[in-house]
């Protein structure tokens, strides 16, 4: 199964409990966030991001991982390559699609390169040439992460 159900602070991508992820930001505070999605929409938006970018790594032997959702305080996602899953921050659902895709690909590339060395960045460059611009835009959404 691609998406796995987890304890209360995580959610099955197509159902389950996902907590509130972010507060409203005014234009003075940063870029406008998308409206807070309901639980099902959050799961759908983040699941679709993984599905969209997975073909970029599939040819390199990366298995389609389990995807866990979690309300995280300091990061947009992480990869547990030895256990075969990635975790995406539920707050990412309030960011534009290109930024969701960037984070999903970033985590998938960690199945190829476990650290942020030159090989990792070369793999990102080959698969998403504008990833640096997306990363820079994502920094403007940092307040979406729940304190």
Kindly give the residue locations of the regions a language model identified.
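Active-site-proximal or metal-binding-adjacent scaffold patches in catalytic folds
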Residues: 1-102, 111-147
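Walker B catalytic acidic pair
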Residues: 107
């Amino acid at each position: 199964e691609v998406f796995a159900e987890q304890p209360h602070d995580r959610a099955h991508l197509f159902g389950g409990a996902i907590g509130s992820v972010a507060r409203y930001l005014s234009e003075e505070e940063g870029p406008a966030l998308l409206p807070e999605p309901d639980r099902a929409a959050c799961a759908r938006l983040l699941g679709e991001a993984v599905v969209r970018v997975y073909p970029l790594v599939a040819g390199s032997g990366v298995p389609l991982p389990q995807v866990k959702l979690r309300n995280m305080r300091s990061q947009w996602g992480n990869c547990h390559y030895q256990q075969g899953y990635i975790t995406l921050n539920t707050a990412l659902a309030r960011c534009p699609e290109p930024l969701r895709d960037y984070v999903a690909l970033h985590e998938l590339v960690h199945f190829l390169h476990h650290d942020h060395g030159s090989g990792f960045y070369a793999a990102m460059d080959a698969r998403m040439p504008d990833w640096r611009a997306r990363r820079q835009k994502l920094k403007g959404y940092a307040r979406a992460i729940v304190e």
